[in-house]
């Protein structure tokens, strides 16, 4: 058995950042991650200026930017073959005025490496939580399995950071509000060549939507399909899928043969939801565990990081003093619910009004809507979506205690 002041379930962006911040504050914390490493492909890899600002405030940015990554300081989309400029990050008030693309495993390994210098923090890999321990209506720990057998972790506070398929929130019986999603996403990779066009994030055709992310030696691609349509894609065969991809991005036509079979594709079943209540006595949920986000805008990592920073800001001092109450847990939801609602509302609008018509073949007019045409023609207006996308709604800053 392990005893800890705080037990964080899940070593994703929210869990690792919160573990770092609590360990930095000298709070006895353990992070439980079910996998042996962070090497999961086709996870979110969009690092927004808001996240790099947090790295800057923690004194980690210089080392962080030594990791392999690519950068874009403007967002462009292609609609019916026409390139449209949407956002310009070069004027936002942040340490980094661009979006970085970095494999999530590099991001998490970096945080884990930096966090291990804090003696108050333990990171336990290959530790899968199977149940919550409750006594007299209060969560007091978790049960887990490890390669060495069963493990019990007792903690004054358990924090669920285990993502959209959270075992913690299911075990806790917390109510989920499903906002719906009409899409799923197929992730795959295709090699990149020197003569390829520059970064155009989205390519919208009459019945296709393809996202292409530059990962230096290859393109990480996301092909949007209608919710539940994976069976139809399989029935049509891999050759038909290759032709569709080539039609969506003609510069990939000579390389789609690299998709040998459907084993080269990974399905992301998109959901947009949030818990009606993020906590119960002894338990708090943050990140995707509290609010599953659509891939629209690539904001998942960054909202999770913002949740972690807000949680540390609100709770770390009280944890240091041994003065944390169950009412304090409610402050996290009160702080973070408004930004989550705003972003989810925007994501649902894009899904319903743009992506659903596109993938269902209902989009007849591929002329960019008037507001996108306005953005394309006004450099000043492009600063506003950059501010919203890059920094988010009511961005957090590090105010939790430093090393003790």
Range-by-range predicted roles:
Residues 2-12:
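Beta1/beta-strand and adjacent pyrophosphate-binding region of the FAD-binding site
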Residues 15-16:
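N-terminal Rossmann-fold NAD(P) dinucleotide-binding loop
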Residues 23-43:
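Glycine-rich FAD pyrophosphate-binding loop
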Residues 48-114:
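Active-site-adjacent segment of FAD-dependent monooxygenases/related oxidoreductases
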Residues 116-129:
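A conserved beta-strand/loop element that lines the FAD pocket in flavoprotein oxidoreductases
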Residues 127, 137-151, 157-270, 274, ...:
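Conserved FAD-binding catalytic core of PHBH/FMO-like flavoproteins
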Residues 279-295:
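Short FAD-binding loop at a beta-strand-to-alpha-helix junction that anchors the flavin cofactor
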Residues 313-404:
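C-terminal helical "tail/cap" subdomain of flavin- and related membrane-associated enzymes
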């Amino acid at each position: 058995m392990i005893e800890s002041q705080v037990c964080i379930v899940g070593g994703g962006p929210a869990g690792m950042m919160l573990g770092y911040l609590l360990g930095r504050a000298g709070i006895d914390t353990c992070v439980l991650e079910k996998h042996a490493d962070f090497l999961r492909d086709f996870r979110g890899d969009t690092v927004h200026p808001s996240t790099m600002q947090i790295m800057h405030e923690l004194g980690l940015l210089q080392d962080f930017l030594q990791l392999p990554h690519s950068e874009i300081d403007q967002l462009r989309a292609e609609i019916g073959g026409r390139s449209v400029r949407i956002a310009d990050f070069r004027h936002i008030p942040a340490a980094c005025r661009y979006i970085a693309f970095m494999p999530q495993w590099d991001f998490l390994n970096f945080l884990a490496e930096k966090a291990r210098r804090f003696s108050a923090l333990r990171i336990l890999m290959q530790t899968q939580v199977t149940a919550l321990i409750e006594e007299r209506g209060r969560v007091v720990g978790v049960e887990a399995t490890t390669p060495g057998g069963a493990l019990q972790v007792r903690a004054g506070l358990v924090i669920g950071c285990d993502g959209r398929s959270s075992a913690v929130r299911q075990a806790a019986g917390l109510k989920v509000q499903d906002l719906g999603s009409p899409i799923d996403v197929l992730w795959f990779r295709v090699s990149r060549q020197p003569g390829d066009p520059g970064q155009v994030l989205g390519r919208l055709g009459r019945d296709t939507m393809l996202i292409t992310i530059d990962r230096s030696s290859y393109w990480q691609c996301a092909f949007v399909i209608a919710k539940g349509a994976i069976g139809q894609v399989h029935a049509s065969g891999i050759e038909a899928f290759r032709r569709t991809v080539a039609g969506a991005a003609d510069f990939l036509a000579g390389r789609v043969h690299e998709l040998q079979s459907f084993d080269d594709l990974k399905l992301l079943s998109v959901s947009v939801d949030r818990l009606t209540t993020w906590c119960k006595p002894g338990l708090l949920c943050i990140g995707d565990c509290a609010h599953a986000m659509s891939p629209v805008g690539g904001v998942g990592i960054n909202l999770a990081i913002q949740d972690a920073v807000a949680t540390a800001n609100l709770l770390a001092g009280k944890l240091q003093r041994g003065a944390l109450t169950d009412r304090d847990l409610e402050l996290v939801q009160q702080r973070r619910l408004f930004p989550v609602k705003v972003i989810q509302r925007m994501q649902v609008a894009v899904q319903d009004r743009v992506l659903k018509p596109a993938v269902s073949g209902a989009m007849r007019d591929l002329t960019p809507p008037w507001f996108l045409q306005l953005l394309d023609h006004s450099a000043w207006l492009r600063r506003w979506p950059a501010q919203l996308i890059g920094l988010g709604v009511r961005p957090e800053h590090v105010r939790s205690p430093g090393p003790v």
